[in-house]
């Protein structure tokens, strides 16, 4: 990742560009005071079902083991064959002063429900995993729109200009649908997510190649920045080129910052 990036401020024009790019990631002040400074979004593909955790379905219990028929709707390969309603195997209780519904298996979490907000209005229009993942992460089952992390970064900015404002932490592998789940969509390219590797070094090439000193790397990146600046001068409005140039400088700063941030020993 970092080896393919790399550069800095090689000219006055590029300096101005990078300042503009960084301004998009700096903390923003909205119309109202925002108590949230960061967002952790858990996309648990294959995680516990909502009907087994926080969303009891009494009607599902009443119809337990009755045959399921879509009646009148077009059948698909995934809906063919016999299907049955199946109730949750867990019991639910009303917890906290709010009386929130929660599964009895959440022994400790039930003590915190008054500090939680439950949203039960989400629906998805696809039975396929990739399109369903796109819908959850971007709001569009066909992908192509900005991911939720891109919108949060766009709205809040980042408090640390030496690190990406939006990082992705895949557990063992990418979710179905791949990198489109953290795409910037039609937002400027620097709002896209930066994945960290789940195994080994979270980010590759945190150190320059053997035999390349920091000073030499700096000189190489400055030259690359100068050449990229000339290339961009004839292609105004190309946010992908602008973001790539800004990412070179970010990558260089990350080489200094990331080792300490990601050292959990």
Model-assigned labels for residue ranges:
Residues 1-265:
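Ligand-binding pockets and gating/stacking loops
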């Amino acid at each position: 990742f970092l080896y393919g990036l790399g550069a800095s401020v090689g000219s006055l024009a590029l300096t101005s560009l990078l300042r503009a790019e960084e301004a998009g990631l700096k903390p923003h002040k909205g119309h109202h005071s925002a108590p949230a400074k960061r967002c952790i979004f858990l996309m648990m593909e294959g995680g516990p079902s909502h009907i087994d955790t926080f969303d009891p379905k009494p009607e599902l219990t009443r119809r337990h083991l009755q045959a399921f028929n879509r009646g009148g709707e077009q059948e698909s390969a995934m809906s063919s064959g016999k299907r049955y309603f199946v109730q949750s195997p867990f019991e639910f209780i009303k917890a906290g002063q709010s009386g929130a519904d929660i599964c009895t298996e959440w022994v400790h979490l039930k003590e915190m429900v008054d500090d939680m907000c439950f949203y039960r209005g989400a629906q998805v229009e696809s039975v396929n995993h990739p399109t369903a993942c796109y819908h959850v992460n971007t709001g569009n089952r066909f992908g192509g729109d900005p991911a939720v992390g891109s919108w949060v970064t766009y709205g809040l900015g980042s408090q640390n200009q030496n690190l990406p404002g939006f990082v992705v932490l895949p557990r063992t592998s990418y979710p179905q649908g791949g990198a489109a789940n953290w795409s910037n969509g039609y937002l400027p390219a620097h709002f896209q997510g930066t994945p960290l590797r789940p195994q080994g070094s979270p980010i590759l090439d945190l150190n320059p190649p053997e035999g390349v000193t920091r000073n030499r790397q700096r000189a190489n990146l400055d030259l690359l920045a100068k050449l990229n600046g000339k290339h961009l001068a004839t292609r105004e409005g190309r946010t992908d080129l602008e973001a790539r140039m800004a990412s070179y400088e970010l990558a260089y700063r990350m080489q200094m910052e990331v080792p300490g941030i990601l050292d959990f020993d």
